[in-house]
């Protein structure tokens, strides 16, 4: 049995995996795949320890895993979404229609050095003073409630929280990081695999990715059906939100790439180079560190 693991908050991004399960793509490939919930410290540690063969993480958060003194033995093997769909959201009435205007307003931070460096870059590039952004350390669970309370801006993934704000009828400004600085069009999220497992089982790894690719291709072409499959697998999700979210994500799975899952070396390396230059990693990341396209066919 192959175990694939990802955090509950990313459940909607597992879409292709659920489709591959429901449509029998794994079975056709001779694979028995179980999707499991990782512990609080995340999917990457579980995959690194061999507790799961594959998992889901993000290029920005993986940087620490790859650059520590004892790097975690995981590698990114496919991009779930072709572009970084995250950005800053705020209520329109706050007037934050460009990143420099975040000055004097509050922002919900999860206190990651990379997160804050990215934010500082876009604010200052737009002429704002980052030291005058009010950083509030908090984890935002309910985006709508947060924006109505004392949080004026939040870093969100549009495919879930942005869609949720639209559904609730909120009038918002959304500033995508990829538009503010092309260096920040990194891969988020990606499928990672355990290095040792993949080395010993290259054919199984290829078969797994091939089935997952079919799943995401199906989701890209059939968002409504894919949403139903996700709701069947995770019934506690909001039905309308899942439908709208899949409508949005269906255009993001492949977007302008030649095929689903493709990771462009220039974009991958560009972001890690920026982390190196800004001393945001313990040890400099080598070119092409942390990803391979060898298993995706």
Model-assigned labels for residue ranges:
Residues 268-297:
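Conserved C-terminal helix/tail region of periplasmic/extracytoplasmic solute-binding proteins
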Residues 142-145, 149-234:
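Pocket-lining segment of extracytoplasmic ligand-binding domains
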Residues 199-277:
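Secondary-structure end/capping motifs
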Residues 91-106, 200-202:
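Flexible hinge/capping segments at coil-to-helix
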Residues 39-41, 50-51, 56-64, 113-114, ...:
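Beta->alpha turn/N-cap motifs
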Residues 18-31, 116-135, 163-171:
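Ligand-binding cleft/hinge of the Venus flytrap
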Residues 1-8, 12:
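Single conserved hydrophobic/aromatic residue that forms the stacking wall/gate
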Residues 35-46, 58, 128-146, 158-159, ...:
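Short helix-initiation/N-cap motifs at beta->coil->alpha
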């Amino acid at each position: 049995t192959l175990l694939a693991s990802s955090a509950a908050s990313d459940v909607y991004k597992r879409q292709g995996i659920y489709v591959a399960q429901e449509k029998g793509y794994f079975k056709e490939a001779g694979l028995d795949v179980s999707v499991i919930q990782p512990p609080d410290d995340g999917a990457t540690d579980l995959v690194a320890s061999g507790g799961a063969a594959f998992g889901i993480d993000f290029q920005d958060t993986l940087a620490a895993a790859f650059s520590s003194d004892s790097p975690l033995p995981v590698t990114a093997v496919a991009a779930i979404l072709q572009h970084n769909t995250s950005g800053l959201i705020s209520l329109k009435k706050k007037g934050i229609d460009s990143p420099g205007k975040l000055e004097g307003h509050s922002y919900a931070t999860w206190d990651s050095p990379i997160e804050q460096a990215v934010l500082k870059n876009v604010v200052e590039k737009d002429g704002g003073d980052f030291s005058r952004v009010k950083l509030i350390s908090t984890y935002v669970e309910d985006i709508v409630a947060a924006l109505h309370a004392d949080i004026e801006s939040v870093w969100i993934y549009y495919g879930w929280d942005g869609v949720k704000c639209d559904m609730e009828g909120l009038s918002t400004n959304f500033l995508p990081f990829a538009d503010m600085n092309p260096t920040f069009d990194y891969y988020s999220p990606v499928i990672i695999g355990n290095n040792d497992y993949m080395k010993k089982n290259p054919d199984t790894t290829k078969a797994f990715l091939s089935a997952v690719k079919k799943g995401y291709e199906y989701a890209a072409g059939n968002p409504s059906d894919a949403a139903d499959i996700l709701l069947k697998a995770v019934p506690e999700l909001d039905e309308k939100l899942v439908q709208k979210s899949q409508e949005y994500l269906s255009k993001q799975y492949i977007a302008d790439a030649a095929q689903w899952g493709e990771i462009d070396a220039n974009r991958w390396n560009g972001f890690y180079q920026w982390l190196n230059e800004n001393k945001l990693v313990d040890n400099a990341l080598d070119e092409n560190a942390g990803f391979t396209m060898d298993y995706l066919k």
